[in-house]
């Protein structure tokens, strides 16, 4: 059997119970923090030498030189060529859908000219180099390659460098095939905090990047947090989440399996169902019990559902949307009639899946939108990974002679009000000196 929390929004203690359910303290392990700091410091000072030492210690790969840790491009093509046709076709179709979607996100530089000839605008520039971390070994995450590499390529990033560990020399061909499809420029068989450090600081072999993206274990996540500021990072991700709003008319087995799809990630993942239909909630609960025993990862699912998940009865769909906005979930399914109507009421969610046939898993792999999403209620102020994460914006200001006089006078007054005399004089010189010299 399995015991999942049952809550009702009508209970006087509901807000407290919901807050306790959502609470996730991403505690920092002092030993882990110290270990990561030591690894990063050694990579920064010793470069390739430290990288080889850590690769031998953690991955048990005895490379003779750091250059041996880089895979040749033909190795990626070989992995793609050796894939079974069905797998290759699925990867290529998913990649194309992700590419088409992200091309819609491209923004262009823009400018305008004021009547006095002053030119103002914004220049869009892709990053010079980005780093992509991909878990390796038996854990195959080709979808992570697609979701992180394709937006970078669409943005026009100059060079994309991928790192992926190969424990005991075990190379994951699915990951390499995905890298080939995405035209990743360089691939290094390194992982852990040492790989993050190499990307952030650079070594004689591994080039320094401007931004690091991609998922990883606690060491990788901690290392990304440590190097943030030296380089950019995508986000600090918490456990996976799904919130399902259902009117009670969807097949309960579908809803139960959608909850499983997040719960199987890890024991801290969260799956919540909101429905005004109590009978439907009970039917979903029964489906969970019935289907759980068929799941290969049933113990992980069980722990997640028992400790961090809930079945919640709400007054109506209006209230369900209000609660959803409070939760700001990573994934939100609107399994209801007229989902287009209800999505207008949603303000905070990483990705919103509309209708009964739109399972969250489709978004994870091949629908097109990115699956790198804000977690832990950060969808209140954060967005999915996208092309814009690999672009920078620079302001363009070209003031005409006539504009200099007008703006200089304004700037001078404001600068003097702030007690910054040099600012004021810098603004004034552009037009007072012209007047004195009789120039236009």
Curated annotation (Swiss-Prot):
Cofactor(s) demanded: Zn(2+)
Pfam families assigned: Histidinol_dh (PF00815)
EC top class named in words: oxidoreductase
GO CC annotations on file: cytosol
Residues the record marks as active site: 330-331
Record: residues binding NAD(+): 133, 194, 217
InterPro entries in UniProt: Ald_DH/histidinol_DH, Histidinol_DH_CS, Histidinol_DH_monofunct, Hstdl_DH
Note on how the cofactor is bound: Binds 1 zinc ion per subunit.
CDD domains: Histidinol_dh
Keyword Metal-binding: yes
Amino-acid biosynthesis keyword on record: yes
Gene Ontology biological process terms in this record: L-histidine biosynthetic process
Keywords: Amino-acid biosynthesis, Histidine biosynthesis, Metal-binding, NAD, Oxidoreductase, Zinc
Substrates-to-products reaction catalysed: L-histidinol + 2 NAD(+) + H2O = L-histidine + 2 NADH + 3 H(+)
Entry EC number(s): 1.1.1.23
Molecular function terms, GO-annotated: histidinol dehydrogenase activity; NAD binding; zinc ion binding
Binding site for Zn(2+): 262, 265, 364, 423
Functional pathway: Amino-acid biosynthesis; L-histidine biosynthesis; L-histidine from 5-phospho-alpha-D-ribose 1-diphosphate: step 9/9
UniProt binding sites for substrate: 240, 262, 265, 331, 364, 418, 423
Family that this chain belongs to: Belongs to the histidinol dehydrogenase family.
Function in brief: Catalyzes the sequential NAD-dependent oxidations of L-histidinol to L-histidinaldehyde and then to L-histidine.
Listed HAMAP family: HisD (MF_01024)
Name of the protein this chain belongs to: Histidinol dehydrogenase
């Amino acid at each position: 059997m399995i015991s999942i929390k049952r809550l009702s929004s009508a209970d006087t203690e509901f807000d407290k119970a919901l807050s306790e359910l959502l609470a996730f303290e991403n505690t920092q392990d002092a030993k882990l923090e110290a270990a990561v700091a030591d690894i990063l410091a050694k990579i920064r000072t010793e470069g390739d030498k430290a990288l080889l030492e850590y690769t031998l210690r953690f991955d048990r790969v005895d490379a003779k030189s750091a250059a041996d840790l880089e895979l040749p491009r033909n190795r990626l093509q070989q992995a793609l060529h050796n894939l079974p046709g069905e797998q290759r076709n699925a990867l290529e179709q998913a990649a194309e859908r992700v590419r088409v979607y992200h091309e819609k996100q491209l923004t262009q530089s823009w400018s305008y000219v004021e009547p006095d000839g002053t030119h103002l605008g914004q220049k869009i520039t892709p990053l010079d180099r980005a780093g992509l971390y991909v878990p390796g070994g038996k854990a195959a995450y080709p979808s992570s390659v697609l979701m992180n590499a394709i937006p970078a390529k669409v943005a026009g990033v100059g060079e994309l460098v991928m790192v992926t560990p190969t424990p005991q020399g075990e190379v994951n061909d699915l990951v390499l095939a995905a890298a080939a499809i995405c035209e990743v420029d360089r691939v290094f068989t390194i992982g852990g905090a040492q790989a993050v450090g190499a990307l952030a600081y650079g070594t004689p072999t591994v080039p320094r990047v401007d931004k690091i993206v991609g998922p990883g274990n606690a060491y990788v996540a901690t290392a990304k947090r440590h190097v943030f500021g030296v380089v950019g990072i995508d986000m600090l991700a918490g456990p996976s989440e799904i919130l399902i709003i259902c009117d009670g008319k969807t097949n309960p087995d579908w809803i139960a399996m959608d909850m499983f799809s997040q719960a199987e990630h890890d024991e801290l993942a969260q799956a919540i169902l909101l429905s005004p239909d109590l009978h439907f909630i009970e039917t979903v609960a029964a489906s969970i019990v019935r289907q759980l025993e068929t799941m290969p990862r049933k113990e992980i699912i069980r722990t997640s559902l028992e400790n961090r998940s809930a079945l919640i009865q709400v007054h109506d769909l209006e209230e369900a949307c209000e609660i959803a906005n409070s939760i700001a979930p990573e994934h939100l399914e609107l399994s209801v009639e007229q989902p287009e109507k209800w999505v207008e009421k949603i303000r905070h969610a990483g990705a919103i899946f509309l209708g009964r046939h739109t399972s969250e898993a489709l978004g994870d792999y091949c629908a097109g939108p990115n699956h790198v999403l804000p977690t832990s209620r950060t969808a209140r102020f954060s967005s999915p990974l996208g092309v814009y994460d690999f672009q920078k914006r620079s302001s363009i200001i070209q003031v005409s002679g006539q504009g200099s006089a007008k703006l200089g006078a304004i700037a001078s007054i404001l600068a003097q009000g702030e007690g910054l005399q040099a600012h004021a004089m810098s603004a004034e010189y552009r037009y007072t000196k012209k007047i004195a010299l009789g120039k236009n």
